[in-house]
Amino acid sequence: MEKLMKRYALTRQGAKDFIICTIVTTIQNIMLMAPVAILYYITSDLISGSISKSNNVAYVIACVIMLVVMGVVFYFQYNTSFFSTYIESEHRRINLAEKLRELPLSFFEKKDLSDLTSTILGDCTVLEHNFSHVMPQFFGSIISTIIIAVSLFFFNCKLAVAALWVLPIALIIVGCSGKVQRGISRKKRKVVLAQEEGFQEYLETVKDLKSYNAEDTYVESLKEKMDNLEKESFRAELGTSVFVISASCILRLGIGTVALVGASLLVKGQIDIMTFFMFILVVSRIYEPMQGTLMNLAAIISQDVNVERMNEITNYPVQSGDGSLDVCLLYT
């Protein structure tokens, strides 16, 4: 719990809510496999010719129950995800403001106003978005994929390997890009701060600039900073997309390998048509949350810079004193 709090700048209650949200998201992802299971049994009855009116009623009831359960799970996941996230965001902003109030003046000498504003508003907003849309979905997808992957080995080991060999490779590609993406995020952050400082300085000194007829020159420097930010943003998006898209392309190879291996085993008589059909359905579904997981992993890696900036403030020693004020008057 302590590591989680320090790693993602969370309160203790926020860390507990995050764990609960991850568990609920895992259940949600597993529930999305329920339509695949019902479709499998319906297709099996159609192929075997054993479908009847009683079976039709049973399938209708199963579909209704599935929809109700999925609706409850989705509702609970939404509440645990967004309500807990915004409550934690409220506590984070208040605690950060209280911490700034207790810091010594030496800290503010090292920081620009735009830097502090960016930390309070920008970094908190990034963490707020990630913990409502990224983090629970990422860890929930990882856990649910592992559970589904283990269950596939009980049906056929060869097809399970053919379906899952791409997952660790795709995760390794994006995971190994962490150092590159953190470097890109830090460079972009410096450019963003330079632009914000430029606009802040312009607003504070606009009268002086006009009086010395230097406004046009300063505006040109601001335009140059904006161009630098545009270029750095392009590099940041390109650096992320290269790794994510490469991993996504490798992820799609799993469908082809399942089709090839499954067709070979089917011709040899080692599996039946329904086992092959089930793996095709599962593979087409299991890669969907993993596709989002790769994007989430890139966002999680890039948020490390935001967490570092917030931890720098929260871990800074506060100004201490006994509350008394000693005044010494000198008379000459």
Language-model regions: role of each:
Residues A214, L238, I286-I313:
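Cytosolic ends of transmembrane helices, especially the final helix of ABC transmembrane type-1 domains
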Residues N79-I87, H91, F154, I172-A194, ...:
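Cytoplasmic juxtamembrane "membrane-exit" helices immediately C-terminal to transmembrane segments
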Residues Y59-F74, L167-L171, T240-G254, L260, ...:
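Hydrophobic alpha-helical segments in the permease module
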Residues Q13, D17-Q28, Y40-Y41, I51, ...:
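Transmembrane helices of ABC transporter permease
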Residues T314-L330:
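Primarily ABC-family ATPase nucleotide-binding module
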Residues M1-L32, I47-Y59, Q77-S81, T85, ...:
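Membrane-integrated ABC transporters
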Residues A9-K16, L105-S106, G122-F131, M135, ...:
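An intracellular "coupling" helix at the cytosolic face of ABC transporter transmembrane type-1 domains
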